[in-house]
Amino acid sequence: MSKTLPKDFIFGGATAAYQAEGATHADGKGPVAWDKYLEDNYWYTAEPASDFYHQYPVDLKLAEEFGVNGIRISIAWSRIFPKGYGAVNPKGLAFYHNLFAECHKRHVEPFVTLHHFDTPEALHSNGDFLNRENIEHFVNYAEFCFKEFPEVNYWTTFNEIGPIGDGQYLVGKFPPGIQYDLAKVFQSHHNMMVAHSKAVKLFKDGGYSGEIGVVHALPTKYPYDPNNPADIRAAELEDIIHNKFILDATYLGKYSEKTMEGVNHILAVNGGQLDLREEDFAALEAAKDLNDFLGINYYMSDWMRAFDGETEITHNAKGEKGSSKYQIKGVGRREAPVNVPKTDWDWIIYPQGLYDQIMRVKQDYPNYKKIYITENGLGYKDEFVNHTVYDDARIDYVKKHLEVLSDAIADGANVKGYFIWSLMDVFSWSNGYEKRYGLFYVDFDTQERYPKKSAYWYKKLAETQIID
């Protein structure tokens, strides 16, 4: 028998400003660190991306036609404040007002993120969120947006605080490209969570209408050998780096003893210290019960083995299967069981991990209120044939994840919506234009859109709520 989803469920599609808009310098937009970083380090740039800056009416019309009733959109901070603070760019304001109006015209509810990996260059180059001044700049920007855009009903402070710390200071695939600095990873996580908490408190104190939450990437971590205490420990430490530290800050308003024990162990082995202040914890504590929802981005799980050597991480950027490597001194190394499928980019396909992660949030953080799956999808080297893509692998991936999501709801989790990554093809931060995720194929030369087989499947799903 087919599984089902609730009648009031959001069947959404996700986007992000820098990955979709293009127009990186148009109409007064300020630079972001990615502009130069992609030029210097990768084989592509954010021009033209999906030209969403001009094509959004087309994309929203397609969304409406294919039953997509929610869209994740992020505001490019540097389109509003080109330097991150100070002078406002009126053309940026006009763009987002027009975009949100089009969403409502098409009956597609916008879920709007304030920061999706794109701190304005002026602030990124002075330390990004490692510089505490930028916490205040972010909160001021957030307050400006809450006032300016009353037409938005769902706000998200940050997209993926974890992968920002990881990408910028551990793997080094995001600007400024620093590697293996675990203290910076945790400090970035912490400072961004303080910024999140201050913005949420301000939103609630200001009496703004609508809801506010945060989007966390939560890849589930398992021990390679569940009977080996050393593997169990490796999975726990890896979970602290990517998930638990951030979830504790979100919903406990502090870091549990067990979390701090793990953090202190990791820093004792790898060096570095954290600056955690009393007033930070006051901010976290004040916001811990104010989050209206948690967005979970879930693509994959990892298995961890105990490991004694030095840290070495190789990022698989070009989809050459088996080329990635991940091992951290004092933590462990990733090694998946042979029978678990992987994508060409070595992303492990394991739907059960989504169920386990949802139930973990429900159990460990009972003040979570409700969950949206804010990103989930399959990156693929799509083959464009007869004006479409026969993306059965993508349909299978999404179907299996929706089935476990249905199980989680049946088992008492409050999950209210799902946003496929991505609505239309966009460029991937560290993989470029070859790795496609969309329901709609984008010809990046002509900017024409073509519905894939998955779009027709998703339309039927949205109409019936039956996962077939």
Curated annotation (Swiss-Prot):
Binding-site positions, D-galactose 6-phosphate: Q19, H116, N159, E160, N297, S428, W429, K435, Y437
GO terms for MF: 6-phospho-beta-galactosidase activity; beta-glucosidase activity
Cited InterPro entries: 6P-beta-galactosidase, Glyco_hydro_1, Glyco_hydro_1_AS, Glyco_hydro_1_N_CS, Glycoside_hydrolase_SF
Broad EC category: hydrolase
Reactions performed catalytically: a 6-phospho-beta-D-galactoside + H2O = D-galactose 6-phosphate + an alcohol
Residues the record marks as active site: E160 (proton donor), E375 (nucleophile)
Enzyme Commission identifier(s): 3.2.1.85
Pfam families for the chain: Glyco_hydro_1 (PF00232)
UniProt keywords, alphabetically: Glycosidase, Hydrolase
Annotated metabolic or biological route of this protein: Carbohydrate metabolism; lactose degradation; D-galactose 6-phosphate and beta-D-glucose from lactose 6-phosphate: step 1/1
Gene Ontology cellular-component terms listed: cytosol
UniProt xrefs under PANTHER family: GLYCOSYL HYDROLASE (PTHR10353), LP05116P (PTHR10353:SF36)
Classification via HAMAP family: LacG (MF_01574)
Family, per entry: Belongs to the glycosyl hydrolase 1 family.
Protein name: 6-phospho-beta-galactosidase
Organism for this UniProt entry: Streptococcus mutans serotype c (strain ATCC 700610 / UA159)
Taxonomic lineage: Bacteria, Bacillati, Bacillota, Bacilli, Lactobacillales
Gene designation: lacG
